[in-house]
Amino acid sequence: MQILKVIGLLMEYPDELLWECKEDALALIRRDAPMLTDFTHNLLNAPLLDKQAEWCEVFDRGRTTSLLLFEHVHAESRDRGQAMVDLLAEYEKVGLQLDCRELPDYLPLYLEYLSVLPDDQAKEGLLNVAPILALLGGRLKQREAPWYALFDALLQLAGSSLSSDSVTKQVNSEERDDTRQALDAVWEEEQVKFIEDNATACDSSPLNQYQRRFSQDVAPQYVDISAGGGK
């Protein structure tokens, strides 16, 4: 399902090269994911700088629209590290190499990985993260961000019954984390944590600091890319 890599490129921070190759991208979308034709046309015909600014407003403000998959499953749990290692091992099996700036659970990267698998395995991989895709799509749709269409398209390609509309009730009950007040609260919390960490750094070993960091963590459900996911 090579179209998954194209969808991943449309999901990433807008890149000049994609704008230069917009006719090729549109041709692939029309052929393999026609439900995204309007989205792709509107995206790639808009000024690049405008879309870059809009992308940052959508995906860089708060965690609830993060494109890091495990942010929505493990958050800061210690299980997140092992999940990263497991996913990285899956990438290495198909020859996918990451550079030092990439995290294995970055959704466009995961889509690139799925794009080299047989179609049935690629669909299974999408189904394994279908609840996350639906939730992200629902949050983006609530914020009137056009990228929600990408998540609905992925769910359609996977054959999932979920969509951005299927999580409307949950999304409406959530407190948004992209408001000025929410962002200020996160900043203040990080400042307090920074001060506390520095206060104990002189008389604590790295191991003790690590244990304190995770002492209150819980272990959320793991998104297993090798098992069947929600439909």
UniProtKB/Swiss-Prot annotation:
Biological process (GO), any one: chaperone-mediated protein complex assembly
InterPro entries: DMSO/NO3_reduct_chaperone (IPR020945), NO3_reductase_chaperone_NarJ (IPR003765), TorD-like_sf (IPR036411)
Keyword annotations from UniProtKB, A to Z: Chaperone, Cytoplasm, Nitrate assimilation
GO molecular function, one term: unfolded protein binding
Disulfide bond sites: none
Keyword set includes Cytoplasm: yes
Primary location: cytoplasm
One GO cellular component, as annotated: cytoplasm
One Pfam assignment: Nitrate_red_del
Location in the cell: Cytoplasm
PANTHER family membership: NITRATE REDUCTASE MOLYBDENUM COFACTOR ASSEMBLY CHAPERONE (PTHR43680), NITRATE REDUCTASE MOLYBDENUM COFACTOR ASSEMBLY CHAPERONE NARW-RELATED (PTHR43680:SF4)
UniProt similarity note: Belongs to the NarJ/NarW family.
NCBIfam families on file: narJ (TIGR00684), PRK15054.1 (NF011628)
Function of the molecule: Chaperone required for proper molybdenum cofactor insertion and final assembly of the membrane-bound respiratory nitrate reductase 2.
Name the UniProt record assigns to this protein: Probable nitrate reductase molybdenum cofactor assembly chaperone NarW
Classification lineage: Bacteria, Pseudomonadati, Pseudomonadota, Gammaproteobacteria, Enterobacterales
